[in-house]
Design a protein with these regions (language model features):
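Gly/Pro-rich turn-and-neighbor structural signature
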Residues: 1-86, 96
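Weak global preference for isoleucine
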Residues: 7, 11, 41, 57, ...
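Structured mid-domain segments that build the active-site/substrate or prosthetic-cofactor binding neighborhood
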Residues: 70-178, 182
């Protein structure tokens, strides 16, 4: 049909390897993965070819997906499945996740491992990487930094993730950068405390306990707010001619903390304080279309 109609392009049909379709149709022969038979090998030539979009929704997003560094048993199995798929397809793709669907307005900590994971994907010959984030609100914590770090690693997996984080903050927040670094560092330290409290580091994309009050105490929320208030102040007294831009970027993070305070700890406030907080939160929710705390599905 394509030849008859002068269509000169290559079309890729993509198989979605998701849930029960995640397992690759392979067997081990002398320690190597091979297809169980020729019929399961995705078509690699011609104008219509077949790729595989591997989608490990069950993964732990605290640890790397890799066979080269220490990881959890769940992700070690996922790494083996990726290698198995890579053995039978030339067009391996990845559908990953960058948010907790039960906690849209909370930090999602897959920062420490993302470099190791992307280096492993590169070793597997990955052709395409997609990461689903919080699309139902217009913002989520450090979402711009998340996009920056991942795009840089996609171009060059040898980059150090912490160096990219520092580079982003220094350029994105201007005179407020050092205080934002303190804020982000305190968030990461809190995750270590959360892992100790929960007795596990296995946090998936539906880990609802991350939102409880024990994970984000009132004193911690106020401490995090203070770092961003300091960042805003330093921008005000700085010499940049882009103060409004930097202040807006800080406010996005600040609003999310205020939203957390409003939902969890507004009972500590007197009426005047409560009214002021509510005005800020309602303004932020409208400005950023940030009304949802959890995923809204077609079923409600």
């Amino acid at each position: 049909y394509m030849d008859a109609n002068g269509i000169n392009k290559t079309i890729y049909l993509v198989a979605f390897a998701y849930y029960s379709y995640r397992q690759p149709p392979v067997k081990l022969v002398n320690g190597e993965y091979v297809a169980v038979d020729e019929s399961v090998i995705p078509k690699k030539d011609g104008k219509v070819r077949v790729g595989v979009m591997y989608t490990p929704i069950e993964a732990c997003y605290t640890h790397p997906i890799s066979d080269e560094v220490e990881t959890c048993d769940k992700n070690a199995q996922i790494a083996e499945e990726m290698k198995a798929w890579a053995s039978i397809t030339d067009y391996l793709m990845m559908y990953s996740y960058g948010t907790n669907f039960q906690a849209y307005k909370y930090h999602f900590n897959n920062w420490s491992h993302i470099g190791d994971s992307i280096r492993f994907y590169e070793k597997c010959g990955l052709k395409y990487y997609f990461e689903q984030a919080c699309a139902q609100n217009d913002i989520s914590p450090m979402s711009s930094m998340r996009a920056y770090v991942r795009s840089k690693l996609a171009w060059n997996s040898a980059y150090n993730t912490q160096d990219l984080i520092d580079e982003f903050i220094e350029h994105y927040y201007g005179d407020g950068a050092e205080s934002v670094k303190q804020y982000f560092g305190a968030v990461m330290e809190n995750f270590e405390r959360i892992y100790t409290i929960d007795g596990t580091e296995d946090h998936n994309i539906y880990y609802s306990k991350i939102t409880n009050n024990e994970s984000w105490t009132r004193s911690l929320v106020k401490e995090l707010q203070s770092y961003l208030e300091k960042a805003d102040y330093k921008i005000d007294i700085g010499s940049s001619n882009r103060k409004d831009v930097y202040k807006e970027r800080v406010f996005r993070e600040y609003f999310l903390l205020k939203d957390c305070e409003y939902m969890k700890y507004s009972g500590y406030l007197n009426q005047e304080e409560y009214d002021e907080l509510e005005r800020l939160v309602m303004y932020g929710r409208e400005k950023y279309n940030a009304y949802l705390s959890t995923e809204k599905t077609n079923n409600g």
